[in-house]
Each structure stands twice: as structure tokens, then as C-alpha cells.
A protein has these predicted regions:
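Generic secondary-structure signature for well-ordered alpha-helical cores
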Residues: 46, 63-67, 115-119, 184, ...
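Core alpha-helical transmembrane segments of integral membrane proteins
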Residues: 137-211
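C-terminal ends of transmembrane helices
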Residues: 133, 176-187, 235-248
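Soluble N-terminal domains of membrane-associated systems
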Residues: 1-122
Length: 279
């Protein structure tokens, strides 16, 4: 149980209305507060959260600190925020979101921080600290590797493969994990990464069948393809458009379509270049 959960347990979650009060921040403090709110939103968007949820959370945080008039506009790559202080002055800042993906663990941590801020309403110094220097759970590469292997092997068997196909898909899953880890560190373009990784995954599946590790090349490929499928991204894009966030929804939809095209292109290229090994 983290420090935020402990505080929530002791104090309870106060309502936002009760926490509102006229803010007494000066200009420099208001600029810092807005900077912190934008950083919070940036971290939120980077986890794959819906932009509607991000906007609502940021507006609520502004109201908690006395900024009743707050306008937030967020898309997958940009957040713009405007607030008005007690003297009627408007403050506007924006932040570019360069990182994107799906990280449910980090999303849960951010939700916990959000609840803590709503409950305790920390001073500006503490707010700046907990947002800009968050406590992150250490990644566990071994468990992630096991997840890749289990997912690839299980899907290969689920779609009609035998145990040998599942084992071959799991072995290829190890290489997919290693490629994913390496390319993510290099911050390579996601479409280029998907195309490259799909090609090598397809090539490894063909090689595994050629040497007798696997039996049905199509089942092995299907199992490994499932590691690349942008299913959550596609679902979120449709949900964003239903929430009338057309720009954010279209951005995610186009990204999902390009990713799917890269997957198909990578596997097709491996079949064209190495397909002769199957004869």
C-alpha cells in the first residue's frame, strides 16, 4: 500500500465542491501551478488514457485550487490549458506530448496521485514535487518476457496449432520482446519498428519450421502477430469519436491502421524473401 493510499484511508476523499476556495496565488505561483497541471495531463495522456478523462481530471484539479474558470483542450500529441485567477487575468500554457502507448500500471499510479491531490490538497511545493518526481513502480522485465512467451504460445495453440507450434511461437516471442526492448530504448518511430519487428518475427517463424521446431507456419505466425495487434488503440479511437473528440479519435484510428499495415507488410516481406525454405 503506497503513501497516497494510506493518506486516502486516513483522511477520506473530500468532495471537490468542499475543497474549492478563492485562490491567493501570485503570477509566478499561478504559472508554476499551470505548468504542474500540464505535466500531470502529459503523463496521463502518455499512458493511453482517453483525452476526455484527461481534460475532466485537469479541470477538477484547477477547481480544487480555486480556479473556477478553466479551459482544457487535449489531443494525443498536445495539451492546451487556460485558467483565470481572482484578478481576472488569463494564463495560457501548452505542452507537447511526444510519448504514447498503453501502460495500465502507470495509469493506476497516476489515478492514485489524482485521488491524493483531491483529498489532501497539498501546497504548491508538494504538488510540484509529486507530479514532476512521481514514484514509479520498477519494471519487471522477466515477468514481461514470460508474458510475451505465454501470449504467443497460447494464441498459436488457440488458433489450431499443436504444442510444437506453441513452443515455436513462444521462442519467437522471446525475440519479439528483445526487439521491443531494444527499439523502445532507441525511441524509433513506432511504424518503422512494427514493420521491422514483424519482418524478423516472420523470418524466425519460417526458420523454426524449417529446422523442425514448429510444424504449422501459419499457426506460429498468428500467435506472434497477436503481440503486435493494436486492438486497444482501435477500440479507444472509436470511443474517442463517440465522445465527440474527433481529432483524437482519428489520430488513434489512423495510427492503428498504419500499424496494422506495417504488420501485414513485415510478415508478407518475410514470406516473399524466405518462403522458398518452406518447399
Amino acid at each position: 500500500m503506497s503513501i497516497y493510499t494510506n493518506i486516502l484511508t486516513k483522511q477520506g476523499l473530500y468532495s471537490i465542491i468542499k475543497a474549492r476556495e478563492v485562490n491567493d496565488m501570485n503570477k509566478e505561483q499561478t504559472d508554476l501551478f499551470l505548468e504542474d497541471i500540464l505535466e500531470f495531463g502529459k503523463q496521463y495522456v502518455a499512458t493511453g488514457a482517453q483525452v476526455k478523462r484527461v481534460e475532466d481530471s485537469m479541470i477538477n484539479l484547477c477547481k480544487i485550487y480555486g480556479f473556477e474558470d478553466a479551459e482544457i483542450y487535449a489531443i494525443t500529441t498536445l495539451i492546451i490549458a487556460t485558467i483565470k485567477n481572482k484578478d481576472g487575468e488569463h494564463f495560457t500554457q501548452s505542452v507537447r506530448v511526444t510519448k504514447s502507448g498503453t501502460d495500465l500500471g502507470r495509469l493506476e499510479e497516476i489515478n492514485e496521485v489524482y485521488k491524493y491531490i483531491c483529498s489532501a490538497k497539498p501546497d504548491l511545493e508538494e504538488l510540484d514535487r509529486i507530479i514532476k518526481h512521481p514514484k514509479k513502480t520498477k519494471p519487471k522485465p522477466f515477468f514481461k518476457l514470460i508474458g510475451y512467451m505465454l501470449a504467443a504460445g497460447s494464441f498459436a495453440i488457440f488458433f489450431g496449432g499443436n504444442l510444437r507450434d506453441g513452443l515455436a511461437a513462444a521462442v519467437v516471442g522471446i525475440f519479439i520482446y528483445l526487439m521491443d526492448y531494444h527499439f523502445r530504448l532507441k525511441k524509433i518511430n513506432n511504424i518503422v519498428y512494427t514493420l521491422t519487428a514483424s519482418f524478423f518475427a516472420g523470418a524466425l517463424a519460417i526458420i523454426s519450421t524449417y529446422f523442425g521446431l514448429g510444424e504449422n507456419i501459419d499457426k506460429i505466425m498468428i500467435g506472434d502477430i497477436m503481440l503486435f495487434i493494436p486492438g486497444l488503440l482501435l477500440v479507444n479511437s472509436v470511443q474517442e469519436m463517440f465522445n465527440k473528440d474527433i481529432v483524437a479519435g482519428l489520430y488513434k484510428l489512423i495510427e492503428a491502421l498504419f500499424t496494422a499495415t506495417a504488420i501485414a507488410g513485415g510478415y508478407a516481406l518475410s514470406m516473399i524473401l524466405l518462403g522458398g525454405m518452406l518447399k
